[in-house]
UniProtKB/Swiss-Prot annotation:
Record-listed E.C. numbers: 3.4.21.53
Database matches in Gene3D superfamilies: 1.10.8.60, 1.20.5.5270, 1.20.58.1480, 3.30.230.10, LON domain-like (2.30.130.40), P-loop containing nucleotide triphosphate hydrolases (3.40.50.300)
Keywords: ATP-binding, Cytoplasm, Hydrolase, Nucleotide-binding, Protease, Serine protease, Stress response
SUPFAM superfamilies noted in UniProt: P-loop containing nucleoside triphosphate hydrolases, PUA domain-like, Ribosomal protein S5 domain 2-like
Protein name: Lon protease
Source organism: Heliobacterium modesticaldum (strain ATCC 51547 / Ice1)
Domain Lon N-terminal positions: 14-207
Biological process per Gene Ontology, one example term: cellular response to heat
Species lineage: Bacteria, Bacillati, Bacillota, Clostridia, Eubacteriales
GO cellular component, one term: cytoplasm
Catalytic activity of the protein: Hydrolysis of proteins in presence of ATP
Amino acid sequence: MAEEEKIRQTIQELPLLPLRGIIVFPYMVMHLDVGRERSVNAIEEAMAQDRIIFLATQKEAQTDQPGAEDIYQIGVIAEIKQLLKLPGGTIRVLVEGLARAEILEYIDMEPLIRVRVREHIEPDVKSNAVEALMRSLINQFEQYVKISKKIPPETFVSVVAVEDPGRLTDTISSHLTLKTQDKQRILEALDVTERLEILTEILAREMEILELERKINVRVRKQMEKTQKEYYLREQIKAIQKELGEKEDRQAEGEDLRNKIAKAKLPKEVEEKALREVERLEKMPPMVAEATVVRNYLDWLLALPWAKQTKDRLDIDKAEAILNEDHFGLDKVKERIIEYLAIRKLAQKMKGPIICFVGPPGVGKTSLARSIARALERKFVRLSLGGVRDEAEIRGHRRTYVGAMPGRLIQGLRTAGSKNPVFLLDEIDKMSMDFRGDPASALLEVLDPEQNSTFSDHFIEVPFDLSKVLFITTANGMHNIPRPLLDRMEVIYIPGYTEEEKTRIALDHLVPKQLKEHGLKKEQVQISENTVRRLIREYTREAGVRNLEREIASLCRKSARAIVKNPERRLSISAGNLPSYLGIPRFRYGLAEAESQVGVATGLAWTETGGDTLAIEVAHMPGKGNLALTGKLGDVMKESAQASLTYVRSRARELGIADNFHQNTDIHIHVPEGAIPKDGPSAGITIATALTSALSRRPVRREVAMTGEITLRGRVLPVGGIKEKMLAANRAGCTTVILPAENKKDLEEVPANVKKKLRFVLVEHMDQVIREALLEPVPVQAPEPPETIPAAIETSVPVYQGMLEETPPGLQT
C-alpha cells in the first residue's frame, strides 16, 4: 500500500512549456522569454496554482505549434521564481529546475498543453566506481575551463563543492556550450553512473576539439608573415565588398567626391583643401581609421553653406508690421532693426551688426530675436551659452582627437543651410571658464566685424565668412560680460514693462495663446482687463511677463477642468472672483509702507530682474557709539552708510538732533530680506533720511521713495537705472520720487503713463531731501536719558518741539 502511494506522488498533471533550442537541467536557474499563446496560457495556469510547470525541449526549434511527436519525452519539472510582463504580450520568467520527469500522456493540447508526467527520484549512489568517475569528470572540467577561457574560475570552485554525483553532472552540463542533442542525451540518462560516463565522453571530445583549435591558431600565426596577412585581409575585404554589392574600385568614391566639390561652389582655398583630402583618401587602405576621419571631414566641408544665403525682406513696412505683431512696445529694438533694413536697401554689401539685448528675464529677448529672423525672412539659429566652459564648444576640436566635431557655430550654420542666418547667442553673461579654456575669448573673433569674415574652426581648418550673419546676443546684466567682448557689441537695453504694457501684452498675446494651447475658445472663457490688472498687481511682481503667463496658464487649466465636467458652462473670470482660482494674493499692491513710520525710509534699487523698492530700517538705543549694518550688504553700501552717518553727525544741530548723540547711542541699520545680497551707492540719501528720522523722531512720508548717492558734504550725486526704479516706484504705489537733479535727463526714458502717476522732486542737496521726506516729530515719552546728556534735552517732546520751531539754517529755502 505504501509503495502504491509513493508511485502516485511521483505522477503529476502539469502545464507544459515547450522550449526551443534550450535544455534546462535540475538545479539550473534560467530566464525564459515566452510569447506563444499556448505557452503564455501554460505560464498563467502554473502561476494560478503552485507555480510548478513542466519544461521539455522541441525536437525542431522552427516548429511553431508543436505536437506530441515534436517534443522530447524527458524534461524537467521546474518552479517559476519570477514573472515579468513585457511590451507586446511577451512574458519573461525566471525558472529553476527541480527534477527530471517523463511524459506519460498528453491530456490537453488547447488552449495549452497539459501532460501527465512521472517524476524521476534520484537514488543515492555511492561506490568506488562512481567516485572515480566524479574525480575524472572534475579534472576534465578543470582543464576545459583553463583551455576555453569562457567560464570564470569562480564557477569551477562552486562545481568542486558539489558532492552529489547526479547534481554534479547537471551543474557541469549547464555550463557547457553543447549541441541540443548532446544536452538532451545527458538529460535522458536517468542512471547516474551512465550519466557520468556520457558527460565524461562528451567533455573529452570537446577538450580535444579545443586543443586542436588552439594548435591550429598557433601554427597559423607563426606561418603568416606580415605581407601574407595584409594580402589575406585585403582578399577578405574584397570578397565581403563583392558579396555586399559594393564597388571594388576606390576611384569611384573619389570621382563622386570630386563631382560634389565641383557642384558645391566652394571658395578657391576650400576647394583646394577638399581636393587634397580626396587624394589622401584614395591612397589610404579602405578600412583604416584615418579614412573614416577624412570622409567625415569632407562631409562637413560639403555640407556647409559656403555660397548659399537667403534674400532679405527689404520691405520696411512689412517687416515693421511683423515686429509689431509679435511684440508690444520695445520701440528702440524695432527702430534699430528697421534702420538696418534701410541701410541694407541702400548698401548691399553691409556687414551684419552685432547686437546685444540686455534686460531682465521675461521681457522677450529670445522671442524678439526669432521675430527679427521672421521679419527679415532669414533662417534662425539659437545657441545657448549658459554654463558653457569649453573653448572647443565655440571653435571645435582638432581632427586628431577621437570623435572630433566642429564647434557649435559651424554646426548651427550647417543646420540653417544659409550663410546669413539670424544667429542668437543666448545668455552670453552666463559663460564661465576652466582648464579647458575661455569660451568668451573665443567669441572675440566671432563677434568682431573686422575679423569674423575669416573665422577659422579648429575642425574645418579653413576660413569661413561669418560677416553676413546677423549676430544677436542676450544677457540679464553687463557686469559678467568681459569688457573686450562687450566693446564689440551694440548694447540695446530692454527695460521692464509698465503695467499698461503688461496689460496690453496679456490681452493681445498671452491670453489668446494660452486659450489656444489649452484647447479653449474665447467664448468659453472670458478674462477681463480688470482681471489682468489684478493679476499684475497682486499675483506677480516682475519686470517681464513670464510669471504673468504662468498665472494665465493656471487660470486656463482650472477653466478647462470646469468645462470638461460641464461642456455647456461659460466662465467669466473677473477681478472679484480671481482668488477663487489662484488663491489669496501673493503681493500687496499699494504703498511700499502701510503708514508713515519713524526710522523707515523707502529706497529704490536696480537688479537684473528690473527695479524694486528697498526698505531701510534704523533703530537706536543707549550704548557706546557703535554702528551695526545688517542685511547682507556689500562694501560699497556699507561705506555709503558710514558716509550717511558722518553727514548726520556733522549736521546734528541743524537736523534737530543732540550734538553728542553718537557718544552714548548705538545705531543699527538694517535692510530687510537679509538673504539677498545688496550693494551700490544709490541708497545713500535713503539711509541718511532713515537715520535723521530715527534720531529726530520725525516720521518718513509713506508715499515717498528716493534714490541718490550722498557725499560727506550732503551733495546728492546721480545714479543709474532710473527708468527701472521709476517703474518699481509706480508698482509699489508711491506717488512722490526724490532723485538727483542730474538725473533729470533720464526721465525722458520713463513711459508717459508712469510719469503722469508720479511727482518727481529733483534735489541737489540732502537738506532738500529732509524737507521733502520728513513729517513733524512724533510726540512720545522718551526713555530715561544717560547722565551725560544735557538737562536741556532730557524730555523729548518739549525739546523737539522747541528745536523745530526755529527753522534750522540748512533747511531755509
